[in-house]
Amino acid sequence: MKTFTAKPETVKRDWYVVDATGKTLGRLATELALRLRGKHKAEYTPHVDTGDYIIVLNADKVAVTGNKRTDKVYYHHTGHIGGIKQATFEEMIARRPERVIEIAVKGMLPKGPLGRAMFRKLKVYAGNEHNHAAQQPQVLDI
């Protein structure tokens, strides 16, 4: 019996919608990363993108435990000398709430071209509206 390997052109991808209201950031991100990679499927193949599309709503209502709301700090660099910038979780939620979930999930995906392809299947929205109704996403309860 030969080992099964999924072919990129035969992979069936579903669309799911997830409500992030009250969900813990890390626990939500691990489940999203698992589904974006396709590890929940029987035909999972490490070198093929077998994951599903995921729409995350209400990113501004995601929860963190402990004092992380004020203590967790996100860093980025502008590219200029002395250009390191920082923002707390509260500031990130106020400015761009989608980035909090995107950063958490991106860190859990593989690095390289395959990981970037998986990350592109994640659609995060701060509010309760999305423009993917034509794909008929199923509700995913996490």
UniProtKB/Swiss-Prot annotation:
Alphabetically, the GO molecular function entries are: mRNA binding; structural constituent of ribosome
* Assembly mode: Part of the 50S ribosomal subunit.
Q: Which domain of life is it from?
A: Bacteria
Alphabetized UniProt keyword annotations: Ribonucleoprotein, Ribosomal protein
What protein name applies here?
A: Large ribosomal subunit protein uL13
Question: What are the TM regions of this chain, as residue ranges?
Answer: none
Q: What is the lineage of its organism?
A: Bacteria, Pseudomonadati, Pseudomonadota, Gammaproteobacteria, Enterobacterales
Any Pfam family matching the protein:
Ribosomal_L13
Gene Ontology annotations of biological process type: negative regulation of translation; translation
Q: Cross-referenced PROSITE patterns, in alphabetical order?
A: RIBOSOMAL_L13 (PS00783)
* Originating organism: Citrobacter koseri (strain ATCC BAA-895 / CDC 4225-83 / SGSC4696)
InterPro entries per record: Ribosomal_uL13 (IPR005822), Ribosomal_uL13_bac-type (IPR005823), Ribosomal_uL13_CS (IPR023563), Ribosomal_uL13_sf (IPR036899)
- GO cellular component terms attached to this protein's record: cytosolic large ribosomal subunit
Q: Name the job this protein performs.
A: This protein is one of the early assembly proteins of the 50S ribosomal subunit, although it is not seen to bind rRNA by itself. It is important during the early stages of 50S assembly.
Against CDD domains, the record matches this protein to:
Ribosomal_L13
SUPFAM superfamilies on file: Ribosomal protein L13 (SSF52161)
Q: Member of which family? A: Belongs to the universal ribosomal protein uL13 family.
